[in-house]
Amino acid sequence: TTIKLILDIIKKDSGSIRILGRDCTSATTILKEEIGVVLDEVGFQECLTPLQIGRIMKDIFHNWDPSLYDQYLQKFNLPNKKEFGKFSKGMKMKLGIAVALSHHPKLLILDEATSGLDPVMRDEILDIFNDFTRDESHAILISSHIVSDLEKICDYVAFLHKGNLVLFEEKDRLLEKYGIIQCTKEQLQELDQSAVIGVKYSSYNVEAVVLRDQIPEGFKVHPISIEDLFIFMIKGVH
C-alpha cells in the first residue's frame, strides 16, 4: 500500500507523502524522472523485446542512458531481441531492474525486486544496489520478504504487521540493541519483563530476545538477525 500511494496508483485518505523533498501529488512529472521502480510483477507488454523497450524508455525519460541500459542487458545475460513474454520470472525481474537504473534515478523503489532470482544473481543485484547508494544523493526504498536482503543493503528498517508500523529504527542500532539468550523458565522470570521482546518455549529450554543492556551477568548473549527479531516480535510469546 505504501508503495502504491507513493506512485499515485491509489489515493490516500488523509495525510501527506513527501519524496525527495517534494509533495507526491504536486510534483508527479518531476518525481517520475527521479524515481526508478521495480515491482514484483514487471509489467511490459509480452510482445516487446528489450531492444524495443529501450527505445520506448528513451522517449519517456529525459535522462535515459542507452549505453548504460545495454551494459545491464549484457551483465544480466538478457537477449535484446527475445520477446518479454518468453522470459522467465527471473529474467523479467532483471530487465525491470535494468530499466529502473538506466535513467539515472535518485530514488529506487523496489517491491520484492530480488524474488525469483537464484542466490548468486540475487547477491550480484544487491551489490549493484549497494553501489547505487554509495552516492549520498541516492536512496532505496525496498519492500521484501527476503529479510536477509534487507540486512545487506538497508540503513534503516521498518516493520509493518497487519497494517501497523511495529518498528522503525536504524538497522545497526537494532542489531546492537537486542540479543538472544537461552535460559530456563525460572531464569526468564528473574529478568525485567519490560526488556523481553519475545519468547520461544521448547521442551528443553527457553529462547528470548532481550534488550542487551538489561541482560544480567552470567547469561551468554547470542547475536540477533533482523529476521530473528521480526519472528520473535510476531510469533514469540510475551
Model-predicted regions and their roles:
Residues 119-121:
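Helix N-cap at the start of a conserved alpha-helix in ABC-type nucleotide-binding domains
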Residues 7:
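Helix-to-loop junction immediately C-terminal to a conserved catalytic motif
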Residues 15-26, 30-31:
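Conserved ABC transporter NBD signature motif
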Residues 33, 39-95:
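ABC-family P-loop ATPase nucleotide-binding domains
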Residues 108-112, 117:
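Catalytic Walker B motif of ABC-type/P-loop ATPase nucleotide-binding domains
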Residues 197-238:
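C-terminal coupling/interaction segments
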